[in-house]
Amino acid sequence: MTEYLAALLPGLAFEAALAALRAAAAPYDAPCREVPGGIAVDIWGGEVRLALTGRAPALAVSAPDMRILFVLQDALGSAFEAAGCPPVWDRVDEGALAPGLSLMRVVSVRQVSPGFRRVRLAGADAARFGAQGLHFRLLLPPAGQVPEWPRIDARGRTRWPEGAAALHRPVYTVRALDGGAGWLDFDIFVHEGGGATEWSTSVQPGAKVGVMGPGGGWVPAAGHVTLIGDETALPAIARILSLLPDGAQGSAHVAVAAADLPDLPRPTGMALHRLEGHGALLPALEAVEVPGADRFVWFAAEKCLAEAARKLLRARGLGKSEMMAAGYWAAEGEV
């Protein structure tokens, strides 16, 4: 069912409103298009229309569900506040949990290999994390404190707890999920100094956490898929391999310890290779054979390596829709 919101932008010229809408759409590579009476842009399966109503510009927002609707409300609020004109919405769910936030409880934590720990969470709406995005943001409250969760304020913006109540907010990949049973699994790469690593060492069953999403990319739709990444990318690579159609062709290359790389379930046409160290990632990307069409190359590792991979892929002639190179962490800290 389609959901709707509307807002006025009093005191803002139409051209300034259009510039703010373009700024809001830019991170999603969503171009504006002309529609009768105004301009529209498509984001996350929803639509935002800007039109001149009377003397003031107005927004009309539609989305396939409430989560996306209120995520758009938050994003548009940010863009138009930056333009000096907060939208006046016809509806704001003030005090509600932030859009896309579910509260779940820890069921179990177990070591699945020397370098990885698997956490199972349970929640009534776990099923929604099985589509529309591979990733989610894990919200961890400070140890020993009563959690304060992000909520919607009077302007439709998400307000996050600050100071001593600030949440740790790492991003993880859904490793497995059973929507009917109401649980999802994710894997933590165990490393010194990691906030989630420390949390997983001591957390007890029944502990409450926030899970926000889903988000990020989805399974590449191309017939030939190349996946390359380091330890931090292994959960996403494993998830993608498990969701690829049977006829998929290509290969996966992971820089990870041998003890941490099982024989991952995958289509018969997808080869799996282990790389020795992060220094082998870019050479593997340079050497891999990629067809001229119906292709997708997925790369995730340290931020600087991802930037180099992006340049390399562009030099090989791949377009934006044929590749992804993401920095999952930075040498100076987590991304």
Regions found by a protein language model. Give the residues of each.
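Extended, composition-driven regions rather than compact fold-specific motifs
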Residues: 1-335
